[in-house]
């Protein structure tokens, strides 16, 4: 496995409107577009920051992989639901890019209740020489127009414009936890705790309810939906995960309401490991189809698992993310960390998987060699071009000089959100209000 990841740290920068140290600046989602040229982050303040990859220059070959701010905009504002007397916070829960179909880029962003479709366009020319309007766009006095001229386009400084194209509201009673764009490029789905809705990208005033697990009596509720995703190639298939650790694969061709799943993926519980925390730590916090569409990756509190779509009985691979926390579940329950929702990601060839942990650590697992590594995203360890050193957490006994004791882990520093470039070994790591971009120098080790 290539461990030679070096970094570009996109820290808090003075003078940037999105970069003051407040809770609103905590990054809540990270997403590459389909080419990897753009990277979007959303934060708790309802803002979206888009980074663009710099073209490689002959003078500075190391600049490949550098991402700089491309555009910043306010996606959501705080609202108040007067019917339920509830505040709706502006925090961006998820961002999903639409496949690019013309010169413009489009993305979906959502908070707890409202999904918005945004269009991002570039302008580097402006029209001049209108017959009936002056340079400021005001209508001229027709008596002063004595000749006709052909308007021309003049070069201007590049301007990135972000405009809202659609607002999809009133589709969810509960908090939206995931959105996923279908491979048909016309529809997408959104999931909350109890329901999944199917939307058409061009229609905002109605959606189709495709999953509803709400019981007639809420006292009978035993599980909630935690994440959902469309299959990357088959537009009729989607999966959703639950707080009980199960995955349900659904086929929209079978029925309009997919309450009856096509396949149920569930690992039988080992009775010897049963404890008060068993159900909490088995809750799936993220599910991702592999790029090939053959596998699914899930993250629960202590592990990441790879499932084969053709085998429902158990995962084909299980990787321990931080098994040393198993003895600390009691204190993690008391400080609510046990409810943290970690995401997971595939690399472009589905051979390596990545997920976050505590103490600003993140983990990588090579599926072919079965090797794994723990790396750290922090200002100290991530000076530009510095090679990341593998970190090790030790539980009692002898300790090497660079090892960190499990008792000195900082649980306030957690990496929940990660993203992997769709084709190259470039990863984006959100560590509270800092974004780190790491790139593998060898760039072929993980392919």
From Swiss-Prot:
SMART domains: WD40
PROSITE patterns per record: PR55_1 (PS01024), PR55_2 (PS01025)
Domain of life: Eukaryota
Keyword Repeat: yes
The WD repeat ranges on this chain: 22-61, 87-128, 171-209, 220-260, 279-317, 334-375, 410-446
GO molecular function: protein phosphatase regulator activity
A cellular-component GO term for this protein: protein phosphatase type 2A complex
InterPro entries, per database record: PP2A_PR55 (IPR000009), PP2A_PR55_CS (IPR018067), WD40/YVTN_repeat-like_dom_sf (IPR015943), WD40_repeat_dom_sf (IPR036322), WD40_rpt (IPR001680)
Role summary: The B regulatory subunit might modulate substrate selectivity and catalytic activity, and might also direct the localization of the catalytic enzyme to a particular subcellular compartment.
Entry's family note: Belongs to the phosphatase 2A regulatory subunit B family.
Official protein name in the record: Serine/threonine-protein phosphatase 2A 55 kDa regulatory subunit B gamma isoform
Native source species: Macaca fascicularis
Gene name for this UniProt entry: PPP2R2C
